[in-house]
From Swiss-Prot:
Keywords: Chaperone, Periplasm, Protein transport, Signal, Transport. Monomer. Residues 169-204 are annotated as: Disordered. The gene is lolA. It comes from the Bacteria. This is Outer-membrane lipoprotein carrier protein. One of its GO terms (biological process) is lipoprotein transport. It is found in: Periplasm. Its main location: periplasm. Participates in the translocation of lipoproteins from the inner membrane to the outer membrane. Only forms a complex with a lipoprotein if the residue after the N-terminal Cys is not an aspartate (The Asp acts as a targeting signal to indicate that the lipoprotein should stay in the inner membrane). CDD domains: LolA (cd16325). GO terms for cellular component: outer membrane-bounded periplasmic space. Pfam families: LolA (PF03548).
Amino acid sequence: MKKIAIVGALLTSFVASSVWADAASDLKSRLDKVSSFHASFTQKVTDGSGNAVQEGQGDLWVKRPNLFNWHMTQPDESILVSDGKTLWFYNPFVEQATATLLKDATSNTPFMLIARNQTSDWQQYNIKQNGDDFVLTPKTSNGNLKQFTINVSNNGTINQFSAVEQDEQRSSYQLKSQQNGAIDASKFTFTPPQGVTVDDQRNK
């Protein structure tokens, strides 16, 4: 009887691992169908009680695996640009820009996960799939991300994604008008405007 219980536990573990592996493979495969795209997005942030904290909108350009431009236009403008080596964050309101090496940037944020779409990143999560919905839970609790959900059509179109932080704050993004195809290289370059304070962390 004890042997049967042990075998049953092993089979359950094997099946669960296979499901997670299949979900991760399907998610990566879907995202791989689109190598570059532009989409507009709306953002809604709520606290742990479901109260609205912020609403915003902007545009997103991605050319996988390492080029992207995340441009928040409302309520306050901010820009996150990767040229493949350097990750720039620019806040026009305070006239400050920060430069970090992309390889040193955290990979446990929803946007980085989507833009990079790397197997090594997905392996850090337990992934469950329900149709076009994928729910990701970090295997370790070291970071601030508690859960990440993304809806991706079979053709690679990202419809929405959301992130829940450890304090239960939820950030939801609805993407629309995704256009696949070539993107002007200028979208993935950034030069700090004159007079902007630059915090260059690339050599620290």
